[in-house]
């Protein structure tokens, strides 16, 4: 791992959003400042935050060809690299690590140093929170990662185990919340905060909601710790994100959404077959907000009342043009200005699961579940939520690829889940409903849905059709799914002893078939 400290110039900020050599985003940042004003109004520390927040998310390689594919939101019509690539479980691109360390962790440490030297405690706490926001995503890709020892000048940099990492996160969230609680009316962040306009009380809700997210994530691996931390999040007087007006969003700062570029400018991504199966089968009113109809009516002849068509992930593809008539994302994504990091719908679904697990204060599972669906429909401006929640018969549909020969790329739906809540159902079926709806609500924010799928097995997604996994990166048995991304090559060659230590902490080979600690192979209840 490169140990050099980034020297960032606050007068000229670039959000490093390039994901391939061809992907460039022009970001016009309204929060940039000039040299003359750097020492005024906190500019010398605050000017970094737009870049920090902007680099929490990945783009084409980090999301579209990893989490977005593995969570089965989007699929490619393009047979990249001869059709043998990430989407078929042969890993060719693995770059989220670099984004988090080069573009988030390094500058965040610089900001914390400046803030601590100037006794700007709120700015320091803010940067520490952003580090957790980013690294808590990265760990779901790889497992053990470098956190406590980041910035070390030792020849070997050791990784944090997942268990240690979550304990550190929770301790630091305590410290961050204490700073925020002591400074609720602080206004210094306002001009640099495109998420909450400097409202510290809303950042406090995010701290609690993030704590709840992490507690739910480790609820199978460390149930006692998860319960303690989840109940702490629920009980905190600052509250949780339970209104869409409090959703934590991250501005694109004048740039284009990566998914819009890939879909509309490159023509390289489409609706997944999994999304077609669930959205069409459940008669979901959000389908027209997420996607636009296919341009060839013949491809949706099996359900003409829902004119949408997806591509199976890991599909056997011959030519790109075969599937480009399938459903693109909605045109509205061209003008989107921000994206959700953590929203009310997710919080309600987490509370629903917490209620199933008996966590104090979580409330009623049914009410939370329905509130999660309602929050998602409202956030997307979709209609028909009441009839949707009352539907006890509609189920995900089987998939047919009309552009392939015979049954190539087809699948029979593994899921028979319905939407309507039934208190008489088992906790397992209730959990399937909760996670299925959490997945549907989490569209184009794939990190947590991919984590949920590996943790719970829900929703019951189709397997990839073409599995090209091999001994190069690990073999995924037929009928199973990828478990993680391997450690990056730069670490394998530049921090070999650190990787050996990390692999021990991983508890299995450094390949895509090794389960992560937060997603053990055990019953959900």
Specify the residue positions occupied by each region the protein language model found.
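Bacterial Sec-dependent N-terminal signal peptides
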Residues: 1-30
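Membrane-proximal, proline-rich intrinsically disordered regions
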Residues: 19-72, 106, 110, 459, ...
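Short, compositionally biased low-complexity segments
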Residues: 19-29, 76-84, 139-146, 395-410
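Short coil/turn segments at secondary-structure boundaries
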Residues: 64-68, 291-293, 446-455
């Amino acid at each position: 791992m490169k140990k050099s400290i980034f020297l960032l110039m606050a007068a000229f900020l670039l959000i490093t959003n390039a994901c391939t050599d061809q992907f460039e985003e022009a970001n016009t940042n309204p929060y940039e400042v000039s040299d003359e004003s750097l020492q005024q109004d906190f500019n010398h520390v605050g000017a970094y935050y737009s870049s920090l927040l902007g680099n929490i998310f990945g783009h084409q390689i980090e999301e579209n060809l990893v989490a977005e594919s593995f969570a089965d939101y989007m699929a490619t019509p393009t047979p990249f690299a001869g059709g043998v690539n990430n989407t078929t479980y042969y890993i060719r691109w693995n770059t989220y690590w670099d984004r988090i360390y080069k573009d988030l962790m390094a500058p965040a440490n610089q900001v914390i140093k400046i803030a601590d030297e100037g006794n700007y405690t709120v700015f320091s706490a803010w940067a520490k929170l952003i580090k957790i926001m980013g690294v808590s995503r990265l760990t779901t890709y790889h497992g053990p990662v470098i956190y406590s020892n980041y910035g070390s000048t030792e020849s070997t940099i050791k990784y944090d185990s997942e268990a240690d990492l979550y304990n550190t996160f929770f301790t630091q969230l305590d410290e961050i919340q204490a700073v925020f609680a002591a400074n609720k009316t602080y206004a210094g962040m306002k001009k640099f905060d495109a998420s909450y306009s400097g409202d510290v009380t809303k950042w406090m809700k995010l701290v609690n909601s993030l704590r709840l997210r992490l507690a739910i994530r480790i609820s199978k691996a460390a149930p006692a710790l998860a319960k303690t931390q989840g109940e702490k999040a629920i009980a905190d007087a600052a509250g949780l994100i339970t209104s869409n007006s409090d959703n934590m969003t991250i501005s694109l700062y004048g740039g284009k959404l990566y998914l819009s570029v890939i879909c509309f400018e490159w023509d390289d991504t489409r609706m997944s077959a999994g999304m077609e199966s669930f959205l069409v089968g459940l008669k979901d009113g959000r389908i027209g907000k997420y996607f636009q109809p296919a341009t060839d009516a013949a491809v949706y002849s099996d359900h003409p009342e829902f004119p949408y068509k997806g591509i199976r992930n890991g599909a056997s593809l011959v030519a790109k043009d075969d599937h480009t008539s399938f459903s693109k994302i909605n045109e509205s994504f061209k003008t989107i200005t921000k994206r959700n990091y953590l929203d009310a719908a997710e919080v309600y679904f987490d509370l629903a699961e917490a209620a199933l697990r008996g966590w104090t204060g979580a409330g009623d599972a049914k009410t939370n579940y329905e509130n999660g669906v309602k929050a998602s429909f409202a956030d997307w401006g979709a209609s028909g939520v009441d009839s949707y929640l009352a539907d006890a018969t509609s189920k995900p549909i089987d998939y047919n690829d009309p552009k392939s020969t015979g049954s190539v790329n087809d699948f029979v739906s593994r899921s028979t889940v319905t939407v309507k809540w039934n208190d008489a159902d088992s906790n397992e079926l209730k959990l399937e409903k909760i996670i299925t709806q959490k997945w549907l609500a989490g569209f184009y924010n794939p990190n947590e849905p991919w984590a949920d799928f590996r943790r719970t097995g829900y929703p019951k997604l189709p397997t990839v059709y073409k599995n090209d996994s091999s001994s190069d990166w690990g073999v995924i048995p037929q009928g199973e799914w990828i478990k993680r991304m391997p450690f990056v090559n730069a670490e394998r060659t530049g921090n070999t002893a650190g990787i050996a230590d990390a692999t021990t902490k991983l508890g299995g080979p450094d390949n895509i078939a090794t389960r992560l600690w937060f997603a053990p192979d055990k019953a959900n209840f």
